[in-house]
């Protein structure tokens, strides 16, 4: 038993989810509706009237609609005035951070009820725009600035070459990591297909998933008209699917308050602790692309909470915007290719309500622990392998007070090697550090992009024109990685470096 005061032990007591599939576009619920309903469902799940006492409200950033001060609008709808009322920045790790921070607030005695929620209505918003339907929602706040996303932090050459969006940046990690592990592109693709098929199996079992069907590895990795290549090696079925309408919420309280409210013990799930760390926002300022030092540090800290062994977790959620993320994560955790990487279904199949997927993953994890699992790992990630947060949750009450200082940034930074200087202009020999190939909607190659090291070991990006069939064939070969291969850099007429294989 623990000797921590029960009013300082945080517990997750309520989970709520809503999926909206309107028959008519105009009947679609706006994000504020989804948020409110998810929170009310979480309160219903807890079986105790807690929402009215919430002193902490964290709202995950959403992009499908814009409000002025959405956290205040939501608090008004709920009839509450929480001391901590927060609407955060963009980041797929943020739901895990908010759950962790709420737990810390309860452990400090600053609040006794905390709510975390997120929602997106991108499917309805997109359909309405395409059909010219005016939605009867809270008026769109055009005067509110759009939140800064990853593209805002990238170099002009990266933007010019099209490698400034998640779907075109993550392939750099995919190619570099698989080469580092000694895989051929064919082997790397097979691992992605098998892993993603496993995510789809979990989605097929999740009543809240957007796509409820199992996909075979071959269906996932084979390009077709419906599964087009977007950025090598990623097809549509390997990337996040943001066209969903979903809301998710969790309620936390103290163990003392949960017991006083008569909440059943079998409902309680305990946050044991976690960790966070970040990479530079500009991905070209990182030392390499075959691993992430912050990801490693965060997952190792989570393992330490589980006795130092990743196999101690009997339920895990590895963030899944693109295959390289859980592929890197499972190796750091010491887990094999037979890993069961999700309790939710993944951002492709469950759906990607942008920043708030991990809210749904946390709900699914609570269900899994209530159903018999003992120790769970929630790992969220944001940006371009940029922001990392892990949280360990348990069916058993903690033996130690929740640790307040949970950044492992120093551990991550300690492993940084020298970062090569970036140059926007280069000539001479160039060695491939990583690469991708960008495709148009019709399946045609637009151009390749190689990340290179120059002869004096500086870093640049270069284009491979669609007309250079020999170099593109070299990049797209399945039995030998082009990472590490040598070629010639020349400046094109538009002042962009171009690379041709030697």
Where are these regions (language model features)?
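A conserved active-site cap/scaffold subdomain adjacent to cofactor or substrate pockets
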Residues: 350, 354-361, 370-373
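A glycine-rich, Thr/Ser-enriched phosphate-binding loop motif common to dinucleotide/cofactor-binding enzymes
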Residues: 93-96, 294, 353-359
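Internal, well-ordered alpha-helical segments in soluble enzyme and binding-protein domains
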Residues: 98, 169-173, 358-361
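Conserved phosphate-binding catalytic cores of ATP/NTP-utilizing and phosphoryl-transfer enzymes
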Residues: 96-104
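Conserved alpha/beta enzyme-core scaffold
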Residues: 98, 110-111, 363-364
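Conserved "HGTGT" condensation-loop signature of ketosynthase/thiolase-family condensing enzymes
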Residues: 1-89, 104-111, 115-257, 263-350, ...
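Nucleotide donor/acceptor-binding cores
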Residues: 111-112, 373-375
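C-terminal substrate-binding/catalytic lobe of Rossmann-fold NAD(P)-dependent dehydrogenases
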Residues: 383-384
């Amino acid at each position: 038993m623990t000797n921590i005061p029960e009013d300082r032990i945080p517990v997750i007591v309520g989970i709520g989810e809503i999926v909206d599939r309107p028959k008519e576009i105009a009947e679609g619920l706006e994000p504020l509706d989804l948020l409110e309903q998810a929170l009310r469902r979480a309160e219903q799940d807890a079986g105790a009237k807690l929402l009215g006492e919430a002193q902490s409200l964290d709202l995950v950033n959403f992009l499908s609609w814009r409000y002025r001060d959405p956290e205040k609008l939501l608090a008004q709808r709920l009839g509450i005035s929480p001391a901590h009322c927060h609407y955060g920045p963009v980041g797929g790790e943020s739901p895990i951070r908010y759950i962790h921070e709420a737990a810390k607030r309860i452990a400090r005695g600053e609040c006794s009820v905390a709510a975390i929620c997120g929602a997106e209505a991108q499917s309805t918003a997109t359909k309405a725009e395409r059909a010219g339907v005016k939605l009867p929602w809270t008026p769109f706040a055009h005067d509110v600035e759009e939140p800064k996303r990853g593209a805002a932090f990238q170099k002009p050459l990266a933007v010019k070459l099209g490698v400034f969006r998640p779907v075109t940046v993550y392939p750099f990690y995919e190619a570099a990591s698989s080469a580092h592990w000694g895989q051929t592109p064919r082997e790397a693709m097979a691992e992605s297909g098998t892993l993603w098929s496993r995510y789809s199996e979990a989605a097929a079992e999740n009543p809240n998933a957007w796509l409820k069907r199992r996909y075979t590895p071959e269906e996932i990795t084979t390009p077709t008209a419906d599964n087009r290549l977007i950025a090598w090696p990623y097809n549509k079925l390997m990337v996040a699917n943001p066209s969903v309408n979903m809301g998710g919420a969790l309620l936390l309280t103290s163990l003392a308050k949960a017991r006083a409210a008569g909440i059943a013990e079998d409902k309680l799930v305990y946050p044991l602790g976690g960790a966070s760390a970040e990479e530079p926002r500009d991905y070209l300022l990182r030392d390499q692309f075959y691993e992430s030092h912050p990801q490693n540090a965060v997952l190792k800290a989570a393992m330490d909470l589980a006795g130092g062994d990743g196999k101690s977790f009997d339920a895990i959620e590895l963030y899944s915007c693109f295959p390289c993320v859980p592929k890197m994560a499972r190796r750091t955790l010491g887990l094999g290719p037979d890993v069961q990487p999700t309790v939710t279904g993944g951002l492709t199949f469950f759906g990607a309500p942008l920043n708030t997927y991990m809210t749904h993953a946390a709900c699914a994890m609570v269900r899994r622990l209530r159903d018999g699992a003992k120790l769970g790992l929630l790992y969220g990630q944001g940006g371009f392998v940029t922001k990392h947060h892990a949280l360990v949750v348990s069916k058993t009450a903690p033996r130690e007070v929740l640790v307040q200082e949970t950044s492992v940034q120093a551990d991550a930074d300690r492993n940084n090697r020298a970062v090569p200087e970036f140059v926007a202009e280069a000539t001479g020999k160039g060695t491939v550090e990583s690469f991708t190939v960008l495709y148009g909607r019709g399946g045609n190659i637009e151009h390749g992009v190689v990340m290179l090291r120059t002869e004096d070991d500086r870093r640049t990006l270069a284009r491979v024109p669609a007309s250079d069939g020999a170099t593109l064939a070299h990049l797209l070969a399945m039995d030998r990685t082009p990472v590490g291969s040598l070629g010639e850099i020349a400046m094109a007429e538009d002042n962009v470096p171009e690379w041709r294989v030697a």
